[in-house]
Amino acid sequence: MTTHVAPQAKDWYQAKDSDTGYQKVIGYMPAAHGLTLAQNDIIQMVKVGIGTIITDVILLTGAMGSSVTADVGDVTNGESIYISAADVSGNSITYMESVDLVGVPFTYTVADTIDVHFEAATPASDQAFSLIVGYITGVDITP
């Protein structure tokens, strides 16, 4: 298992600074970035700041390979998983609205990334996938 970082998740990348908006990583193809994916690889896709609430998550994929599934969220520590075990073996669109899988909005208390985790089989590195994340920022998290 390897963790890869998409350009939008790197330290130097500045996310939109409005109170609400969408962060998009469109047409990310691992092979175009010199990557060969393996089963259980994680790709950090979008940076999120302190006080961010995620409102929507959309994952679009090409045919990632037989039996491949994907999780989307903070997959390294499991605090917020927005899409779980989505079948991405063929072309797919998976959408999550408003809340993570535990049923309540998750507010980030530290800066983090939203990741895509390919499971169950080795995903195709020559297939593009896109992640669109809707968010609200500037939420006051002080008690």
Q: In which residue ranges do the predicted regions lie?
A:
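Surface-exposed, low-hydrophobicity beta-strand/loop segments enriched in small/polar/acidic residues
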Residues: 2-143
